[in-house]
Amino acid sequence: MVWLPGINDLNRDKNNTNNDKDPNNDLFQDLKTRLDSLPTSAIAIASFATGAVTAVFITTFHVRYGRRLKNGEWITPDFLGRNSWIKGVVTSVGDADNFRLYHTPALGGYTWPFKFRTIPSLSKDLKDQTLHIRLAGVDAPEAAHFGKPAQPYAAESLAWLRETLLGKKVYCQLIRRDQYSRIVAHVHLRPRILPSSLFRGRNVSLELLKAGWGTIYEQAGAEYAKGRKDEYIRIEAEAKFVTKIINSLLPIILNRAARRGIWKHGKSAETPAEYKRRYAG
């Protein structure tokens, strides 16, 4: 006689098959039961904590990558203490060792493919919208101001910095605030080939020394790129003496070679620091 399975046997086999297909079913049911057993107040607290953590994360992310620093008052001591990096476009160069920067945060709408904002070009639109940046570690010839005459080569030094920076994107590591409320910073140009998100371009302070349009700043509060003061000294020395060496070795180019920048008439040229001391009284 052939045995035929009953309905109960079929249901039992079906249940066994379902359990075989979902080995985590018991664990899921256990977790669901535990969650359902939690008091409403505990669930509310957990939801609030999750929301608070999310809000803090979003706010921190926005402050770091999306909020624009409109002027120096937006830069807090904590921000300077971290020696944070920012990027922006130079909108004006009024002196040979400082300039105005329009901050363009990474997620602020100033960079493709998310570009939907433009940088103002009119002076009235830039009022109170820029950071006053001072180049770290260097000093350039003083322009005429407060009744004092201009230092020799002040105009040439200013022209060099304008040619180097004006209208260009730069990266600034913010160091401190000086006595004139300017932000002292290590300033770098954009790299020519490599991605700017991973690499920095040329250090503008070192380029100023190399061109011969400034000296090392050695007064109180001097700041140099980490571990590179010797490089500042070396580059300044090269700017002073390189042409003298060339002229001594290659007289044929004597008429074309000239000392660099402020060292044109020799290393005895008055430095910006000496100029300031002379007019301090």
Curated annotation (Swiss-Prot):
EC number: 3.1.-.-
Disordered: annotated segments: 5-24
Superkingdom of the organism of origin: Eukaryota
Basic and acidic residues composition bias: residue spans: 10-24
EC class of the enzyme, as a word: hydrolase
All residue ranges annotated as the TNase-like domain in the record: 84-249
Main location: mitochondrion
Xref: InterPro entries: SNase_OB-fold_sf, Staphylococal_nuclease_OB-fold
PROSITE patterns linked to this entry: TNASE_3 (PS50830)
Active site: R134, E142, R182
Cellular compartment(s): Mitochondrion; Membrane
Membrane topology annotation: Single-pass membrane protein
Transmembrane region(s): 41-63
Stretch forming the signal peptide: none
Family: Belongs to the LCL3 family.
Protein name per Swiss-Prot or TrEMBL: Probable endonuclease LCL3
